[in-house]
Amino acid sequence: ACAGVRNGYAVPGQLGADRWAALIGARRLHSGPALVVCAGTATTADLLDADGLFRGGAILPGVDLMLRALAGNTAQLPLADGHFSDAPRSTVDAIVTGCLQAQAGAVERMFAQIADRPGARCLMSGGAAGRFADLLHLPLQRVDNLVLIGLATFARATPQPPAMG
């Protein structure tokens, strides 16, 4: 446990340090139930109860990884640089829209597990957060540097050894 967060993973040591730090940062910013989303190379969506228990979460390929996977593993699809559209009318727009909708859908499905709890909120960070945050229909707080906020909180909460000398 650290800074009010307890690790509920089946094997606590398997939780990545970046996810742990993001959970600690989220707890520092919000005391209620939260879905902690970090959108980068991978997208993580982690559930944090109001009492600080990390219940588990999901890891999925990030937006760019999805785009590259489609381009690299299909015969006819390009590396898409299209735009989101409610009704895409080009292949590149359809690819981008599909990848962004997949991200938003995964986040919303995870959030549904806590949506009925008072004060439930999604805290979202990461370089790709801005690409699909506007597609989400849930209480959302964008946070720059959530992992760094968590690391700073961890450092303050960790007893320091006495100075030598």
What is each model feature region?
Residues 1-34, 50-165:
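Nucleotide/phosphate-binding catalytic cleft detector across ATP-hydrolyzing
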Residues 36, 43-48:
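Short beta-strand scaffold segments in enzyme catalytic cores
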